[in-house]
Amino acid sequence: MNKQDFVEITQRRYEYAMGIDSCNFDLLRSVFCDEIFMDFEDYSGKPAAKLSAEEWVESCKPLFIGLKATQHIMTNPIVEVEGNTASCQMHMQALHFFEEN
């Protein structure tokens, strides 16, 4: 992996956060290849799984549309590149603000 690989891969994580926080689901989709592996087991209790990027983006829409605001903060990226495959593992803090009634 060279420096440019690292920069481009970590840039995707910022686009991921911006896509979710702005409800720009086209931007969110553009971050991913067609098949992805997502691991939110610590959050949801569901085991990590492969799914299509479209499935992931569609599953995000009902979670974020209608919120007053969100902010996703990501740190400590660990990037690995092997041939044409890359992975990025990181910590994320997500803040979700609801409309007051």
Regions inferred by a protein language model and the residue ranges of each:
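Short, cysteine-centered beta-strand-loop-beta hairpins and adjacent loop/turn segments enriched
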Residues: L95-N101
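Long hydrophobic alpha-helices with heptad-repeat/coiled-coil character
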Residues: R12, S44-G45, E100
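Short, low-complexity N-terminal intrinsically disordered segments enriched in polar/charged residues
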Residues: M1-D34, N84
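A solvent-exposed, acidic/Ser-Thr-rich amphipathic alpha-helical stretch
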Residues: F25-A94
